[in-house]
Amino acid sequence: MSSYILFGLENPLLDYYVGGETATLEKYGLKSNDAVLASESQMGIYKEPCVSYSAGGAAQNSCRAAQYVLPPNSTVFAGCVGQDKFADMLLESNEKAGLRSEFSVDPTTPTGVCAVVLSNNNKNRSLCTNLGAANNYKLKDLQQPNVWKFVEEAKVIYVGGFHLTVSPESMLCLAQHANENNKPYIMNLSAPFLSQFFKEQMDSVIPYCDYVIGNEAEILSYGENHGIKSTDVQEIALALSSVEKVNKKRTRVVVITQGADATIVAKDGKVTTYKPNRVPSEEIVDTNGAGDAFAGGFIAALSQGQGIDYAVTLGHWLGQECIKVSGTTLPLPKKQFPLP
């Protein structure tokens, strides 16, 4: 008997680590701590020497992180991949993490790849994504009975904002299901460019969101592109939390991480801050995926019926463990979360 309590949707990608640090950033017009979809002029980055590979894709990372702290067979992730070795690597990585993959397959398009450039002694990361097959996910893929049964079984639905560029229809379908069944519906803001260039799609989903997770750059972009005059992270988070909701049974919670600085939670017109434990710089190996790991801990806690304090604390712990190892991974053998 399965017990899949968490369903995630976004883009299954393979992270492709590229060396060169700031020289590579300059060569391809990239910024540190940013995420972009690759333009034609940036496609050459995927021919740069590869330092290492790891399974990526923001929400996929979060679902693997959630499964790290949840009982076996708790988490399902959906998206579209190609029919190639990269897809095999993703499936293998998810299986190793205990994450169930419900992928549609497009044999004509390669699996999506995300170039990762680390800089500043691996403390900063820049992401440049070629979506590939991930861009071809369709609503009909989600509605296949063998996939939809996991949506119906789930207690919590998590969607990555990057899917706004792919299939907002699928995001809305999940949102409506969550609303009708009073399940928490969580979206990640994912990247600053989404609020700017996919504003209409984002604004169609936000009213359904019970929780919105993001970082400082993402919430600032949201404010700038939604006519919010303030550049204060707390004020913008409060404004987003008060956008009208479809499901009136619960108020919206906006959760904003700020790296090593305090995480902000805006809810019911109030802001609460949570200071994460600081990881000594000599223990930091790779900051890529820290925000994904935080989101994974947060959604794992919610799927088990835990409150916000616990969810933020678990998210912080997973984020801290993630940056101590290379890639968007977590330590093995598994560590146990030190319960408060």
From Swiss-Prot:
It catalyses: adenosine + ATP = AMP + ADP + H(+). Its cofactor is Mg(2+). GO terms for biological process: adenosine salvage; AMP salvage; purine nucleobase metabolic process. PROSITE patterns: PFKB_KINASES_2 (PS00584). Its EC number is 2.7.1.20. GO terms for cellular component: cytosol; nucleus. The active site is at D292. It comes from the Eukaryota. InterPro entries: Adenokinase, Carboh/pur_kinase_PfkB_CS, PfkB_dom, Ribokinase-like. Keywords: ATP-binding, Kinase, Magnesium, Nucleotide-binding, Purine salvage, Transferase. Pathway: Purine metabolism; AMP biosynthesis via salvage pathway; AMP from adenosine: step 1/1. Pfam families: PfkB. It is an enzyme of class 2 (transferase). GO terms for molecular function: adenosine kinase activity; ATP binding. Belongs to the carbohydrate kinase PfkB family. This is Adenosine kinase.
